[in-house]
Design a protein with these regions (language model features):
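The feature marks proteins involved in alpha-glucan
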Residues: 1-32, 68-172
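C-terminal beta-strand-rich structural cap/linker in extracellular carbohydrate-active enzymes
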Residues: 41, 84-87, 628-649
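C-terminal accessory region downstream of the catalytic core in glycan-modifying enzymes
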Residues: 52, 477, 481, 527, ...
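Conserved alpha/beta catalytic core and glycan-binding cleft of carbohydrate-active enzymes
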Residues: 118, 350-351, 355-507, 514-518, ...
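Substrate-binding/active-site clefts of carbohydrate-active enzymes
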Residues: 149-328, 337-357, 363, 374-375
Length: 649
């Protein structure tokens, strides 16, 4: 019997790779006349399939042996129409038998324990064959991050009861606050806000919510993968039927596409929920990195980390992403802890996506860091190696986040908008997507994801309140914090790169000062649609800035000349001011932008460059650009805590 350390030595040998690397299909291959199951299990002595009628409970209908083929692949053919039938594998390795689901399962029963054979076209939504990924112009590429659960859990959201917290909530049109017919919520709200993409926190099958129990008190963000190619059952209206979660997930995607909104999937291939999972039960120790003593490396901070550099692990990751892109028409992928993947895997995946029809439009970006020390001994897909990554693989820029609002690990640490001394120097770096700074390696401005809040750490509103007050009143409509919120938005939404915001940032979302709510109560995590109506002025401010940004494409340009064209003014500290001319022929609404940031509590006077300048946003109203606002020249006044934007006419 091999020790974990001996398995590690074997798996990292060139001989093992040569004998077991396989490039063909794996998982179920369905036809009406029969289904072939293929499983890669090169270390197994014996493999059998267990057949079930149901996804939970019920006796096994029978067990059949799989036949061993070359390169570690086992297979069995099941005659007849197998759609809707469930199965597991029993894999015997080194004298130990493991019963497990199929790592390549397309759907599953309750809690993902039994895989289900699926004839996808049979259960697809009407007109699914006509659905397609949305082509979002670069100037509209703003990402709004939300959990399926949070989106519609609020009883006041107007969504029918059976769909609250589910995929189907994204399909209901005409919802309003408390169904009163006034303030739009959910899908209608999103369409009005004007974001280009919705980034969905994990929608694959995760293990931290029990699908067999009511969800009244259960909650988790879902960064606990169980089945990578299966939609999460708790987000469906019936987790006992494997086809329902697939159909309803596709209905959600089709609805967002019909609204002109792309769908980005938050993927967590860097670790799995438990070591007892389909990958580790099929080929123990292969898919996860190990320490020299054979124990699991824990660069994820969650107990294990995926070995993307091993050939069949790399194949699995790429196969899975391509499956979601093709079968579910996903518009982009956000990689959790991307620093745990090797550069070669990420670049190979980017090339594979590019090879799909219109695949170059699929977004790909991630967190360029790890959750702890790792046994990855290849180049990591992190900030330090940004130059090695494809120019179309983006990164979350914590430099931008921290300089604007302050560090995320110290609740009281201020940033530029809260008056941190000296921080104005780095605001210029953020504006130019750090292309003119030595704080990041050489990169394209479009690789930078500019943001100030995401699901991790404090919401922007809570951070602002924690810096301002010893005992914050989080639900209060604090005028100074509102002004700082507008300033923060005014900065990152005028930075080069791709903007990103946490759902609800635009209406002062609060989690009452809690910075890590991954398993807190549903009521704390859900979007508060009454608060959205209460802070409708802030919502309109974000909406106006999103529209303004779309009118000036050069802010979203990918060429090196664009950040180089930004001219910064010499102003009294801590004011920041700059201009950027429009690129020739890019269809911009103005010949140039001129932007000033004032992080003080006082009005400030500055001088505009020569020429005529239309006031587009004064830091309170961001929709002035839509109407006949005044044309300025000479000296102008900046409001306290404001981002003031002018367009040259």
């Amino acid at each position: 019997m091999k020790t974990p350390a001996e398995w590690k030595t074997l798996f990292e040998s060139s001989a093992f790779a040569r004998q077991t690397n396989y490039s063909g299909p794996l998982g179920p291959e369905y036809t009406p006349s029969g289904t072939r199951l293929r499983l890669w299990a090169p270390t197994a002595q014996k493999v059998s399939v267990n057949l079930y009628r149901r996804g939970d409970g019920g006796a096994c209908m029978g067990t059949l042996p799989l036949e061993q083929h070359g390169q570690g692949v086992w297979s069995v053919y099941l005659p007849g129409d197998q759609h809707g039938h469930y199965y597991t594998f029993t894999v015997e390795v080194d004298g130990t038998a493991y019963e497990t689901g199929d790592p390549y399962a397309r759907t599953a029963g309750v809690n993902g324990l039994r895989s289900m054979i699926l004839d996808a076209p049979r259960i697809d939504p009407p007109d699914w064959s006509h659905d397609h990924r949305v082509i979002v112009p670069a100037s509209r590429r703003t990402v709004w991050e939300v959990s399926v659960r949070d989106f519609s859990q609020d009883p006041a959201c107007g969504v029918r009861n059976a769909w609250r917290g589910k995929f189907m909530a994204f399909t209901q049109k005409g919802t309003t606050l408390s169904s009163a017919g006034t303030f739009p919520t959910c899908l209608d709200y999103l369409k009005r806000l004007g974001v280009g993409y919705v980034q969905l926190m994990p929608i694959f099958d995760f293990g931290s919510v029990d699908e067999s129990r009511p969800l009244t008190r259960q909650y988790n963000w879902g960064y606990d993968p169980t089945n990578y190619n299966v939609p999460e059952g708790s987000y469906s209206t019936d987790p006992t039927k494997g086809e329902v979660r697939v159909r309803e997930c596709k209905e959600m995607i089709a609805s967002l596409h019909a609204a002109g909104i792309g769908v980005i999937m938050d993927v967590v291939y860097n670790h799995m929920y438990r070591s007892e999972n389909p990958l580790n039960s099929t080929v123990p120790y292969y898919f996860f990195r190990q320490n020299p003593d054979g124990s699991f490396s824990n660069g994820s901070g969650c107990g294990n980390e995926f070995a993307s550099e091993r050939p069949m692990a790399r194949k699995y990751l790429i196969d899975s992403v391509l499956y979601w892109a093709q079968e579910y028409h996903i518009d982009g992928f956000r990689f959790d802890l991307m620093g745990l993947y090797d550069v070669d895997t990420m670049n190979e995946l980017r090339a594979a996506l590019d090879a799909l029809p219109c695949g170059r439009n699929i977004l790909m970006y991630g967190e360029p860091w790890q959750g702890g020390g790792s046994q990855l001994h290849r180049y990591e897909a992190n900030k330090a190696n940004l130059t090695m990554l494809s120019e179309r693989i983006g990164i979350f820029c914590d430099n931008t986040r921290d300089v604007i609002k302050g560090g995320c690990f110290d609740a009281r640490e201020p940033g530029y908008v809260e008056g941190r001394p000296g921080s104005f120097w780095d605001i210029g770096g953020a504006v130019a997507a750090w292309c003119r700074s030595d704080k990041l390696p050489a990169h394209s401005p479009s690789q930078i994801v500019s943001y100030v809040s995401a699901h991790d750490n404090f919401t922007l509103w809570d951070k602002l309140m924690l810096v301002r007050y010893a005992r914050p009143e989080y639900t209060a409509a604090d005028s100074a914090a509102l002004a700082q919120n507008r300033l923060a938005a005014g900065i990152y939404l005028t930075c080069m790169g791709m903007p990103f915001l946490q759902a609800g940032e635009e209406f002062a979302r609060t989690k009452k000062g809690q910075g890590n709510t991954y398993r807190s109560s549903p009521s704390l995590n859900r979007l508060d649609w009454k608060r959205a109506a209460q802070f409708h002025g802030l919502v309109d401010y974000y909406r106006g800035l999103l529209g303004l940004r779309a009118q000036f494409p050069r802010l979203s340009a990918s060429d090196a000349a664009s950040p180089a064209a930004i001219k910064f003014f010499s102003l009294e500290h801590p004011l920041v001011g700059w201009t950027l001319p429009a690129a020739p022929g890019d269809g911009a609404a103005w010949r140039a932008l001129c932007v000033f940031y004032n992080p003080t509590e006082e009005e400030k006077r500055v001088r505009l460059p020569d020429g005529q300048w239309k006031l587009l946003s004064d830091g309170v109203s961001s929709a002035l650009w839509k109407g006949p606002s005044r044309v300025c020249g000479g000296e102008v006044t900046l409001l306290p805590y404001s981002a003031t934007i002018f367009g040259q006419v």
